[in-house]
Structure formats: structure tokens, C-alpha cells
């Protein structure tokens, strides 16, 4: 869509956006004193919003912007007048290949905290750039859903805070019995006083030894990338735009320059982001940049992108002082790609930041560095980026936030839905590229029992999985064929097993994109393989695993598409299983396959 915006001049209000689709009718609430509360109706997208404004002490409610639907209703109520809305971000996209674009998710940030995300965090990311302003009104487009959203902002008068600085940053250790502990001490001045932040952590023998440094005598040099190829912005077609840096003004400046893409990012952190090191791609060659920041991080993160199919599109984060009224440093970082979200890494405290460009890829970093990563900015190359599903369940971004709306019933054992991109995730090494598991065209499992094939349908509405102590006993599927429900026969034995799981999808908004599992013999003396575990991946997340994850792993990893039917072999157990896939090749073209593991690039 076309982005229209006007920026504030000399403290005057500004309008930004709208972000989203072109459908629906335009609306504009106008400008008020502040926002008091927001009511959001949402499900697979944002159905509607309604806002309570304040106008010179009087409450004013807007009309409901959007449709009458919504499976969930949330109210964001600010602590007026002390709390006010400073930023909004979210995603927009279509529910299916042919659908119109609307707002899929929204997150609101005040001067105190974040609220959300509400909806499904899927599609193209957008964000209001941080500019020291507060939101005083909304505008956009609306129909059956909230099709697009924009904001009116008003600059906030700046306060004159006393200057302060960090004087000393040290890392020390002490022994207690046979254990060794390390701690980080930061000392900073506020007038004539000191504030101290202490971080304790058990020593990790794999980490390098730490050293004490005084900021006045720290040996900091301006880094330059070491490469045999001279690079400049003019050598990259189309040039690039620079956003930021955001954060503090301490340390010295660095600029890695402009490359073709980003392959990997290594972070070191404790109370803030201590350092960052980036592996770039320059015309097919991996080029490592220098480490920017200090030493002494207690936590190390490695973010490996599946380059070139996975592209870094946005960098967001927060910054703030390490102590009361101290200088600002980067506190947290989140990396968004065309496949999902990596992070956040660090504590999301303080003002947030992002760059405004909707379509493009990050091709370089810049900022300021000292004992910490003081600030960060990005070079962005404007281009069209396609939104892709992860190429393998191994690469799925799976935060532990199961606040979704999809339904799973009768689940006494290992029955869960894990959203693929929503909320805060467990901080592990994300996006680590793993080789796909070798497998044939399916079905996967043993060659015992009788072959069966349900055929191809319009979609899948629900699945019943019955498991025994050591294998999947049976599976039964409810399909959709042109709006009519069609049940398959039960594939497998008649035993009730240990547990039966009902996986009910939000059809037609939710579709199965991949299955994975394990197969192997029932016991060491059995020469026949059966399916021992199953997991189902949908457009919203992952269901399972159901059964014991032992034996040989298999997956139906493929290009973007959806599962329209199952086939396999069965006897007293589910001996083998395969899928019928409908693959999307772009321009609304599709084709069917009975296999699933062949790369189609």
C-alpha cells in the first residue's frame, strides 16, 4: 500500500500511516489530548478497535472501527494522566493467497510498558518510529476487519535531566568452596554520588576470562571490516537508506558499511547488550565484521539466518540507562525476517525503536560502541521481500506463549499448541540452520499392514490421534470438500490406546502446512516399523508431539503450501503415513504432489 505521512515541525502534530491494505472505507478520529483506553476485538486478525480519548479533561469515545466479529476482546486501559501511548506496531497481510490485506496484529507501547501483541503476529511488520512524541489520535481504513491503521502524534516536551556518566566497569570473581562466582560491577555518577549495579552468575568454563577496564583508559579503536573486496554504497545496485542510530551518545562511532545481506549475528549481554558481531554476505562470500562493544557478557546468543532464503527485514529493540539517570545503552534487540521473529535478546526496558521502511532488507549496521553497545542503526536496501514459511520444523520459531485461539480437546498427554510467532520466546539459539532429514516421497514408516489413501480434499478440519504406550494406534481425519464435511475411516487398530487426542483447527483460516514424526520397531525383536510419534504444523503454529519421539525422524518439509489429504499403511497400528500437498508457486498457481520432502527451488 502507499504510505502517506506528515512529520512534525517545531513541535506541531504529525500524521503517520496508515499501514495495511486498501480495502474498506477511510476513517479519521482526529486529534485529542491523549488516549485513555483501547478495546480490541481479534481472532485470526484484528476485527475492530474502539478508542476512548481525552479532550481537555472530557472523555470522548470513537466509533467502532471494523466489523462485528472477534473471538477475543481485550481492553488496554492506560493510567491516565500519568501513562500515555507513545508507539504502535504490528503486522498486516491476507488470510489466504487470494484474500485482501488487513491488519493481523497490534502491539501498543506506553511510556511505562507494552501491551500485546493482539491478533496473529503474521505478515508484513510495521512500526511507528520513535520520535519523542505521544499518540493523540488514530486514522485508517475499515470494513469487515481493521484494514489499515495510522496515528496522529504530538511531540512531548523534553525535560532537562542532570548529566551523568559511567566511570568504571569491572568484572571480578570470588571462590566459595570448590565453586567460583563472577560478578559485574558498574559504577556511575549522579552529581556527587554513585549507583552500583551488580550482576551475579555461576562461572561458565566455556566463556573467555574477563578483565577489568576503566572507561577513561579503555583501549577502544574504530573498527574497519577486513576484506579483500573494497565496498561502497555505489557498488550495490539501488543504494541504501540509513536509519538511526538509536540509543545513547556515549562511546565512539562505527559503521560496517553496506553488503548484500546478513548471514549471522552474535550477541553478548548481561544487564544490556555488551557487544555485537555480524557475519555479512557480499556477493556470495561470507565476510565477518569486527566485534562492536565491550567484554564481559554473561549470556551469548548466536542467530544464524537461513540465507539467502531467509532475509533480515527489521531490527527493533529498546534502550535505556544501566542505572538511575545514567547514559543510555542498548538494552534489548529483536530481529525480524521474512520467516518470523528472532528474540527478544535482553530485557525489553526503556523506549523502543525501529526503522520505518515497510519493504526492504537490512544490509549493514552502524552505531556507537564503548563498554557496551551504546547505539545501533541499520542500512536498508529497498526491495520486495516475499514472506516465506520456514523450510523445516527445525527452523521454526517457537516461543512458549500458548495464548492462541485454536482448540485442542481431550489432552491429558503432551497436547499443546505453540504459536509460531507471538509473544516472548525462550532465549535459545534461534534460526540455526540444520540439514533437512533425508526421506523419500512418503509414506514414512513401515511396510506392514494394508495401504490406504484418503485422496485430495479442500482442507482439513480436525484430526483424532490415538496412541498406545509405544506407538500411534490409529488416526482419523475430518476433511472439508467444497463446504461439506467428509470423515475418513479409522486408519489403524480398534484399541482405545492410552489416550485419544482431538486436534481441531480453525478451518478455513488455519491449514496444515507440514507434518513430522518418528517411526521404528515396537521392540528390539520386531522387524516391522510403525509410526511412533506425530506433530502437525499449521499456518499458526505446532500441535504435538503425540507419542514417543524415538526412532527415525521424518518430515514433510516442502515449499510453501498446505496438506489436503493423507495416505499410508495401517494394521493394528498406524504403520506409515504420507501427505498430499498443494504447493504454491506464486501468481496463484498451484500443483499437487503426493510427496513432501523434495526441495523445489
Curated annotation (Swiss-Prot):
Keyword list (alphabetical) reads: Lectin, Repeat
Signal sequence range? none
Residue intervals of the Jacalin-type lectin domain: 13-155, 240-382, 438-583
Q: Does the keyword Repeat apply?
A: yes
User: What GO molecular-function term can you cite, just one?
Assistant: carbohydrate binding
What is stated as this protein's family in its record? Answer: Belongs to the jacalin lectin family.
The protein, known as = Jacalin-related lectin 3
Amino acid at each position: 500500500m502507499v504510505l502517506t505521512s506528515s512529520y512534525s515541525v517545531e513541535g506541531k502534530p504529525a500524521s503517520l500511516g496508515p499501514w495495511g491494505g486498501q480495502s474498506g472505507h477511510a476513517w479519521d478520529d482526529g486529534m485529542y489530548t491523549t488516549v485513555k483506553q483501547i478495546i480490541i476485538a481479534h481472532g485470526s486478525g484484528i476485527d475492530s478497535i474502539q478508542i476512548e480519548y481525552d479532550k481537555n479533561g472530557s472523555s470522548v469515545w470513537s466509533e467502532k472501527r471494523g466489523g462485528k466479529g472477534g473471538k477475543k476482546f481485550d481492553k488496554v486501559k492506560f493510567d491516565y494522566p500519568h501513562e500515555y501511548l507513545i508507539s504502535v506496531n504490528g503486522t498486516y497481510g491476507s488470510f489466504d493467497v487470494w484474500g485482501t490485506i488487513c491488519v493481523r496484529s497490534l502491539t501498543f507501547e506506553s511510556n511505562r510498558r507494552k501491551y500485546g501483541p493482539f491478533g496473529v503476529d503474521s505478515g508484513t511488520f510495521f512500526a511507528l518510529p520513535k520520535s519523542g512524541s505521544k499518540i493523540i489520535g488514530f486514522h485508517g481504513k475499515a470494513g469487515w476487519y481493521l484494514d489499515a491503521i495510522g496515528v496522529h502524534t504530538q511531540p512531548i516536551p523534553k525535560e532537562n535531566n542532570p548529566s551523568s556518566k559511567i566511570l568504571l566497569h569491572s568484572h571480578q570473581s570470588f571462590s566459595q568452596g570448590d565453586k567460583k562466582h563472577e560478578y559485574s560491577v558498574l559504577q556511575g555518577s549522579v552529581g556527587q554520588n554513585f549507583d552500583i549495579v551488580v550482576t551475579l552468575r555461576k562461572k561458565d568454563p566455556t566463556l573467555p576470562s574477563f578483565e577489568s577496564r576503566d572507561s577513561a583508559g579503555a583501549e577502544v579503536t574504530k573498527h574497519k571490516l577486513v576484506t579483500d573486496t573494497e565496498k561502497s554504497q555505489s557498488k550495490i545496485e539501488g543504494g541504501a537508506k540509513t536509519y538511526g542510530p538509536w540509543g545513547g551518545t556515549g562511546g565512539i562511532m562505527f559503521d560496517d558499511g553496506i553488503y548484500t545481506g546478513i548471514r549471522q549475528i552474535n550477541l553478548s549481554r548481561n544487564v544490556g547488550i555488551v557487544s555485537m558481531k555480524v557475519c555479512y554476505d557480499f556477493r556470495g562470500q561470507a565476510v565477518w565484521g569486527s566485534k562492536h562493544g565491550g567484554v564481559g557478557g554473561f549470556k551469548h546468543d548466536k542467530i544464524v539466518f537461513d540465507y539467502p532464503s531467509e532475509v533480515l527485514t527489521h531490527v527493533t529493540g529498546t534502550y535505556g540507562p544501566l542505572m538511575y539517570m545514567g547514559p543510555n545503552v542498548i538494552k534489548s534487540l529483536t530481529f525480524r525476517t521474512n520467516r518470523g521473529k528472532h528474540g527478544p535478546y535482553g530485557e525489553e526496558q526503556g523506549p523502543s525503536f525501529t526503522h520505518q521502511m515497510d519493504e526492504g532488507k537490512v544490509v549493514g549496521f552502524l552505531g556507537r560502541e564503548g563498554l557496551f553497545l551504546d547505539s545501533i542503526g541499520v542500512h536498508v536496501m529497498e526491495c520486495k521481500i516475499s514472506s516465506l514459511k520456514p523450510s523445516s520444523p527445525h527452523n521454526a520459531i517457537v516461543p512458549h506463549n500458548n495464548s492462541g485461539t485454536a482448540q485442542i480437546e481431550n489432552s491429558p498427554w503432551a497436547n499443546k499448541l505453540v504459536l509460531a510467532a507471538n509473544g516472548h520466546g525462550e532465549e535459545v539459539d534461534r534460526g540455526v540452520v540444520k540439514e533437512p532429514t533425508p526421506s523419500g516421497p512418503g509414506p514414512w514408516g513401515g511396510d506392514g499392514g494394508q495401504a490406504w489413501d484418503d485422496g485430495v480434499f479442500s482442507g482439513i478440519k480436525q484430526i483424532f490421534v490415538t496412541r498406545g504406550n509405544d506407538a500411534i494406534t490409529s488416526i482419523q481425519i475430518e476433511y472439508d470438500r467444497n463446504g461439506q464435511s467428509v470423515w475418513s475411516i479409522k486408519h489403524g487398530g480398534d484399541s482405545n490406546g492410552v489416550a485419544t487426542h482431538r486436534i481441531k483447527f480453525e478451518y478455513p483460516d488455519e491449514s496444515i502446512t507440514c507434518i513430522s514424526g518418528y517411526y521404528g520397531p515396537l521392540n528390539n525383536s520386531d522387524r516391522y516399523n510403525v509410526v511412533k510419534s506425530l506433530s502437525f504444523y499449521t499456518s499458526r503454529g505446532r500441535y504435538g508431539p503425540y507419542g514417543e519421539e524415538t526412532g527415525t525422524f521424518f518430515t514433510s518439509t516442502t515449499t510453501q503450501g498446505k496438506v489436503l489429504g493423507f495416505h499410508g499403511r495401517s494394521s493394528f497400528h498406524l504403520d506409515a503415513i504420507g501427505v498430499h500437498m498443494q504447493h504454491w508457486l506464486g501468481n496463484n498457481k498451484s500443483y499437487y504432489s503426493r510427496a513432501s520432502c523434495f526441495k523445489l527451488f
